[in-house]
Amino acid sequence: MTIGRAKVYATLSKIFYHLFYDEAIPKDCREIIEKFGEIDFNLRSVLVRELRGSVLIKDMPQSLAEVYESVMKDFYERYGFQASELHADHIAVELAFMSKLVEREISLAQQMKEEELYKIRAAQHRFIKAHLQPLVKNLPSAPLLNFVRDFVREDAKYLYSSLVGEKNEGADNN
């Protein structure tokens, strides 16, 4: 499941980068996402440049919207992620960050570093709940955006059950 999660996040991020710059979506990206069902990648009715938390989260106070991007950059830096030239709260950047967190999770699992593994999963869940989910729940309706919304929601559930399971296993071993 984990390797698939990293690939889906990375692919979605690439798709939004290509859409941001009005470039064709690479065939390999289309093929990965279309494995989940037929997806219409046409987002002409949506301004891809506006797919940002500080723009779309309607109940965000103006004072927070003004510092939101720097908060995001600080969060990224804590995990060694450098935001691209796009706004730090743009969906392409947030999806790329999740991909990097999942890749780190894979590495920690391979090294059998259980304590760090729990922490990185908790960080993923925190990021989804605090940043990515509020963004995707405010996305306009379009097939690709609906897919992103559903994927993020299901990933949050997966992470939560994984974290609860690990916590219970740790309690059983004490």
UniProtKB/Swiss-Prot annotation:
Family matches, as Gene3D superfamilies: TorD-like (1.10.3480.10)
Pfam families: Nitrate_red_del
Name assigned to this protein: Tat proofreading chaperone TtrD
InterPro entries given in the database record: DMSO/NO3_reduct_chaperone (IPR020945), TorD-like_sf (IPR036411)
SUPFAM superfamilies in UniProt: TorD-like
Superkingdom of origin: Archaea
Primary location class: cytoplasm
Family of this protein: Belongs to the TorD/DmsD family.
GO CC, any one term: cytoplasm
Complex formation: Monomer.
Function: Binds specifically to the Tat signal peptide of the TtrA subunit of the tetrathionate reductase.
Species lineage: Archaea, Methanobacteriati, Methanobacteriota, Archaeoglobi, Archaeoglobales
Organism: Archaeoglobus fulgidus (strain ATCC 49558 / DSM 4304 / JCM 9628 / NBRC 100126 / VC-16)
Subcellular location: Cytoplasm
Keywords: Chaperone, Cytoplasm
